[in-house]
């Protein structure tokens, strides 16, 4: 229930996938991955199809998963603002690591400017 609330998907359990918007489908897919409490969660364009409110909810849920269950979360994104919540930022260009740095100015998802 906490995960459903964080991802704003309460009430979607009884609906068919074709009845959900793209953003709702993405949030449900994220919940399906997170409910298993994985040791590693790979997220490619995690917030790509989401509005700002939903994006913040998803990022907060991922942060909670990381904090509570010590899940390693790898977020692949073109949204530089999201990197603000990372412990480590790795930039890749043309398949090669350009930089690999500890984020000394980490912020919470709610402090991000998306």
Q: Could you describe each region identified by the protein language model?
A:
Residues 41-44:
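Catalytic Walker B motif of ABC-type/P-loop ATPase nucleotide-binding domains
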Residues 16-20, 24:
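Conserved ABC ATPase signature
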Residues 37:
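Conserved catalytic motifs of ABC-family nucleotide-binding domains
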Residues 1-11:
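Conserved ABC ATPase "signature" region
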Residues 30, 58:
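Hydrophobic anchor residue at the start of the ABC signature
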